[in-house]
Amino acid sequence: MTARNVKLKVMDNLALDVKHGYRTSMSKTSHANTTVAVVCNPTSNKGKGAQVGGHVIDLLRGAGRKHGFDVIDVTGTSFDDSLANARRRGDEYDYLVAVGGDGMVALGANAVGCSGKPLGIVAIGSGNDFARGLDLPVNRVETAVEGIVGAIVRGTHIDVDMRLVTSLPDGHAIDSTDGTDVSQSRSPIDRYYAGML
């Protein structure tokens, strides 16, 4: 296996006290020319993912007007399209916010891994294991967005260790659809894996 260690910057909620709001006064520093990208799964939960994604974008745009940052949507028509959009448009944003469950966190990690751009997580999936492991808000959209805004304004994040796997030379895979040996025909792996120990 060919792999290397990398760090993922995850926007934390250290700036947020759920009961009282921000722990310290927010910086009045302008974040002009700062852009936050949002990616969600529009087909999840029979379209409810798109509704929540739209709500997150609205909340971030409201905060952006107050704190001086812009918000763009990089969501595609599928997981692969969204990942391609987030990667292709990476020079257009400074932060990426993934809205969804562990699958969308994986998409976000694969989009910004090694870029140094922080990943915000609005955990609204069925499991949300990654967010739970970091003590991020789960199924609390407004609280998650408020914490993300605090992390943007204060410049805080958590470093999460990951491995970038680029190949599995000794690996062997079977295509379950027709039993064809695909170990030689597939493209090399280029995925980030993060986890809690």
Regions found by a protein language model. Name each.
Residues 1-20, 168-180:
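Intrinsically disordered, low-complexity polar segments enriched in Ser/Thr/Pro and acidic
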Residues 7-99, 106, 110, 142, ...:
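ATP/NTP phosphate-donor binding region
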Residues 37, 61-65, 74-76, 81, ...:
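Catalytic core of DAGKc-family lipid kinases
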Residues 43-45, 101-104, 124-127, 197:
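Short glycine-rich anion-binding loops that position phosphate/pyrophosphate groups of nucleotides
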Residues 50, 103-106, 128-130, 138:
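Short, flexible micro-motifs
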